Amino acid sequence: SRGLGDVYKRQGKYYVEFDKHYKAQIKELMAQGQSEEEAKKNAPVMLEAQEMLRKWEARDPEVYSLWETMNGWVYEGFDVTYKALGVDFDKVYYESQTYLLGKSLVEEGLRKGVFYRRPDNSVWIDLTADGLDEKLLLRGDGTSVYMTQDLGTAYRRFEDNKLDDMIYVVGNEQNYHFQVLKLVLKKLGYADWSDHITHLSYGMVELPEGKMKSREGTVVDADDLIADMVATAREMSAELGKLDDCSEEEANAVSTMVGLGALKYFILKVDPRKTMLFDPRESIDFNGNTGPFIQYTHARICSILRKATEAGIDFSAAVQADYLPEEIDLVKTLTEYPSVVAAAGENFAPSVIGAYVYELAKQFNGYYHDHSILREEDAATRTMRLRLAGQVARVIRRGMNLLGIDVPERM
């Protein structure tokens, strides 16, 4: 099946051709005396693109059919890649379904005197009094821009879902755009909505080879990165003997789980607002602050509990036992989990959960290094330790699940 990478490769060829001709035409027009800004607008290939947009909005059959075909490639690729990452959506809004609503909001703004029309028929809003710039809302030929579409989409989302809050998870290069969106909605009279919009701005992810950015030529192929992560996880897990007792099917499943877990955790453990450098091999280190370290801790506890069950040890009921200071500390850490989740939600910071789960896993490993569980001779103490280990595994599993990361029971 084709993933997002195949879509980028297919469309990338067209973009390369477009970019080559576009730059050549700009250079030629500038040589004829036009400014760079004028040349960018008047380049024949750009005028053709603008004409196609006009035809698309007019539902020209040929252009609309081409658009549907190309969009089909994109959605197909999205579906494959999202499925590999374990991502799905309850509802998807398409700009093609909301831009007309956006246009009607622009007309509403004109009637209210919030927007103004320039001689070339384009529609703008002047936000200079608010410390921002003038913003284009509708082109002179009547076609929409990003802001038009986002106005319509925001309106539709609030209307459809009666939202308390709406969070946009979009890169930090769009900070200004969302300042404008909120202010425009407010000036249109939708302060109840604009006051409940949050832009969760995130920094770029960089690889040793360069930045991962979706609108520039430096984009990294998501499908290739996922495949590389799974292959690296398989290689490193095998080197450490963590797949020795696995069948081929189990080894494939564990490698996929570890590879994706490493990728997700390495990104999510960092405050989303920060730019980060992603190192694939470092992310699969079984001894550091990584997803695989936490996954291995969970699998290790599951192995202990499995062996106890196989040995006929019943630890289903609570018992009276004396707790060591380290065990009391583990219990205290476990009781912090609900407040950690609440803090992560309030601050839109999954990294808080990542840090907590890592510390819990590290704390358990230190405890288990110093104290036996299965070989403990006192039955009550052994039962208490098994139940405590089970609670640690349960919280690790829940925390990682909130991060979208699966944890294996065997490794």
What are these regions (language model features)?
Residues 1, 5-411:
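Non-catalytic interaction-recognition regions
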